[in-house]
């Protein structure tokens, strides 16, 4: 039986590299987002999250703290670990971390293919669909 993932806020260079590996596999490799779009000027100010199973990086996300909002970004789970509830666990961890830092309003740019996933977790779609990294997205928000 496979171990369950553990999630933590990145505190070391090694953990940050692991988070970037996950993001590179998912966004640059699978979705063909350019490296220049994937890694941006907000990296240094973001709270990065890493998910691992037995030391293997399987998931990553980042949170940017923007005024009253915690913006969840770069949510990624490697393909072979999807459909096991790990994305939901990653999202819960990210929301809990933002709450721990005093935030109760959350937003994200959801890929339209993932809108139902975020809606299941209490996010509501707002506005029109827009392109980000050549992928259709929609703003989604949640309070509490």
Q: What is each of the regions a protein language model found here?
A:
Residues 24-54:
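Active-site rim helix/loop that mediates acceptor-substrate recognition in acyltransferases
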Residues 50, 56-64, 71-76:
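Conserved beta-strand in the GNAT
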Residues 65-73, 82, 132-137:
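A conserved beta-turn-beta hairpin within the catalytic core of GNAT-like acetyltransferases
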């Amino acid at each position: 039986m496979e171990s369950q993932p553990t999630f933590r806020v990145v505190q070391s260079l090694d953990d940050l590299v692991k988070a970037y590996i996950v993001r590179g596999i998912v966004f640059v490799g699978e979705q063909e987002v350019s490296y220049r779009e994937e890694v941006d000027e907000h990296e240094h100010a973001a709270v990065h999250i890493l998910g691992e199973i037995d030391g293997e990086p399987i998931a990553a996300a980042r949170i940017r703290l923007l005024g009253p909002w915690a913006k969840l970004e770069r949510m990624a789970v490697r393909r072979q670990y999807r459909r096991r509830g790990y994305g939901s666990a990653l999202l819960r961890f990210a929301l809990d971390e933002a709450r721990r830092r005093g935030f109760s309003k959350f937003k994200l740019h959801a890929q339209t293919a993932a809108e139902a996933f975020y809606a299941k977790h209490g996010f509501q779609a707002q506005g029109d669909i827009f392109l980000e990294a050549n992928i259709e997205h929609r703003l989604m928000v949640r309070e509490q």
